[in-house]
Amino acid sequence: MDRISGLPDEVLVKILSFVPTKVAVSTSILSKRWEFLWMWLTKLKFGSKRYSESEFKRLQCFLDRNLPLHRAPVIESFRLVLSDSHFKPEDIRMWVVVAVSRYIRELKIYSSHYGEKQNILPSSLYTCKSLVILKLDGGVLLDVPRMVCLPSLKTLELKGVRYFKQGSLQRLLCNCPVLEDLVVNLSHHDNMGKLTVIVPSLQRLSLSTPSSREFVIDTPSLLSFQLVDRNDNSHTFLIENMPKLREAYINVPFADIKSLIGSITSVKRLAISSEVGYGEGFIFNHLEELTLWNKYSSNLLVWFLKNSPNLRELMLVSETDDHENLGMLSWNQPSIVPECMLSSLQKFTWFKYLGRPQDRDIAVYILKNACRLRTATIKSDTRLFTKLEMITELRLSSQASSTCELNFS
């Protein structure tokens, strides 16, 4: 220890940066040489979801006493994991004020919420010029003041927070001129109503909702879009601008998203879970990779095969909660072999394959008609004897591609 203590402060602080903040703080009891070294750390994380009430009280006393004395001129990252039943909002606001005064770059707060969500964010945070990443999760009330300017903010994550007014989020977004990544996980009582996302600089957008929503999206620079509906609701979409979109993940099993589907036809990669048809007039000319989750119907598979002329890779995932009704319940074979089967499809993978007659018919159809297929991989969790039967059935089927490698696992 004496040999280590003889190292320069910069080296010791660098060593401390590789251990959890709690461990770094504990080194202050080693000697006077170590007493204040942790205060030069630029990345701080305090709290835990597993803390007891007494541990949270000790943490509060520690932060009240020591955080204002922190010596690092810049705090790169400040993370708090709290239980709001043990902290007053004004205490948390004071800690964030200190972090803002040290030109904070990343702020992440998780607050478990047992009662009414609290406003724990100081007004100074909304004008922090150095802030690049802001992540809020749980018991947080977002009360956006009139004065907002976050010129450096590139990543914003809001999970389960409540909004003071319906326009709070939009006011915040309007004042983030370089925002690139946005994650919004809504809740039943978030006070949001219509969700409006108008951000010219945005490149990646992820939305999750447990209830019916109206979405207004204008994101001309968007490259990646994710939408998750946790309760099979209906939604209204007004999408003005997504010309650069390259990948999308859509998990809305029973929602009618015809108003959305026309805005994602430019994607190269698409993962989608849906049981609702989309009608005619949509062509995915750029789509190369498609992942489909289907419980009940093969109609969506047929629809995409017909409307994706340049598809190169197809992945199917069988999903169900009822073991007696596994797999797609119907297979309506296309009357004409889709263009992608004849000219572009090279890779086919089926996850959780169960070998029911309709599943087998789909797999056999693809093997029989995909002329350019290079690999077909069937992954199954069934018993060994059943799996051997599946393998035999598919190996005996005819294949349009003489170079196709058929794999089972």
From Swiss-Prot:
It comes from the Eukaryota. Residues 1-47 form the F-box domain. This is FBD-associated F-box protein At4g10400. It comes from Arabidopsis thaliana. Residues 330-379 form the FBD domain.
